[in-house]
Amino acid sequence: MNKKSYLRRVRLPRTPADWLEAVMNFIFFLCGMLAVCCVVLISVYMVVSGVPAIHKIGIFKFLFGTKWASTAAEPLFGILPFILSSVYGTLGATILGVPIGLLTAVFLSKAADPKLRTVVVTAIELLSGIPSVVFGLLGMQVLVPAVAKAFGKASGACLLSAIVVLSIMILPSIVSVSVTALNAVPPEYEQSSLALGATDTEIWFKISIPAAKSGIAAGVVLGIGRAIGEAMAVMMVAGNSPNMPDSLFRSVTLLTTAIAKEMSYAGGLQRQALFSIALVLFVFIMLINVVLNVVLKGGNRDE
């Protein structure tokens, strides 16, 4: 690169419009760096706060211990029941919520009458705005007794109730992002298939959904993040006993509810252990995003 071309690229602003452009670019840069700094600071804080307890307890005892008795004379800090409960709860909510959300998105994007689409979209937007505590309250008053009665259990506060509540809570994220992704599919894809004699259902499931898979996957990840990070609603319907989740009807504690339940009165090593649980949860979220990026990049290369 010669000196003149370099000077043209880095020339100082001369007119008011140039100065405004430079200032706005700097503001955009600061906003981007602010987001990066927030992630870095949160990561550093979680590591600094969570590692000491893991070091004191022992990483194997902490991650794979099956007993949690943080207030006992000889406290135990095994979080394997919390990890498995969170994994099972999130997996169950995903299994229930993703098909419903995806089919709803296909209906809204491709098949719904405009008036009906408006009604459904409004309902989904309202669903996304309902506070977590309201979901928990409705689950506690309606779902928990219904589960107990339907399956003949003494209490319906269990893993199954948590899964049902979470599957409802993740629907708005999955539906809204999937609808946007499906609407972005070029019409030529569908028109070409229609000209070849494909039915609407074949076009939707063999053309539209595969073409929108990146956006749909992003919606699923948002839903998974909502499910694995939810605390209040789950705490009201899951039972909050530190049991291994060996049954759908078992009263369980998830990673998030363990923190919310004990942080208000925790101190010393117990408080440090709760920060360690938060660190484990933070790592889970990061791993989910990394796996998604790897899968999507692999899919794009295959295409």
Which sequence ranges carry the predicted segments?
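Transmembrane alpha-helix signature in integral membrane proteins
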Residues: 79-107
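Generic hydrophobic transmembrane alpha-helix motif, especially the helices
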Residues: 125-170
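Cytoplasmic-entry segments and transmembrane alpha-helices of multi-pass inner-membrane transporters
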Residues: 100-139, 303
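C-terminal transmembrane helix and the adjacent membrane-cytosol boundary/short C-terminal tail
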Residues: 179-183, 187, 194, 261-303
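Interhelical loop and adjacent transmembrane-helix boundary motif
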Residues: 234-282
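Transmembrane alpha-helices
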Residues: 177-178, 200-236
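Amphipathic cytosolic juxtamembrane alpha-helices at the membrane-cytosol interface
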Residues: 21, 100, 113-118, 186-187, ...
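Transmembrane alpha-helical segments of polytopic membrane transport and secretion proteins
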Residues: 1-32, 292-303
